[in-house]
């Protein structure tokens, strides 16, 4: 076994990637697969799962190490059933990626639709962290499993973005809860960390960053580039390294409660 395989290899590991059919979730799933882990992709949409599995099945030697499951991560009952089904089909999971999240629209404070506000909070904070972390944490403690949880924080975890009130609140809370849950679960050998993606153009934010008529950057898109020392948007594949690092007990066995920005320097633009 090479040094890199020993340090970063995930052979024998079983990962659940909640929200694993999204753009970021698929990349994280692919990274874990390539590092040797078995991967169960969770999503509410079977169609999305099928599309993700079609792509992920091209990873060499993925047969028998890859599956998908329709799970609502905001439901304690469904998450527990999903965990049990994963254990039956791939083995007991010891890695959890909390990848559910997103935003719906943008509005001035006084025009914010509170129904949408609550929906975004639920998506990012309840389904995107609390429910899976609670269920997996309990299962791991009862079965004496030293697991690893990776949450998704955001640039909004550190500084609020304009007009996305619920997303700002949820991602700030995600950073706080990453530290809080890491502190509480540490005595059980469970690590909790996060990755904070910078600005990556995807389905949910494309309209905010790129003018759909001209194909040019919007004013917001230009502002992001101007505040990013690397001078560009990120590529989702650039999240793979941090994913494998945090999942590895050898490489990150003494790392817990941290959020790793993968942002091209966005957070230090004012230095």
What are these regions (language model features)?
Residues 107-109, 113-121, 224:
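Substrate-binding pocket helix/loop in short-chain dehydrogenase/reductase
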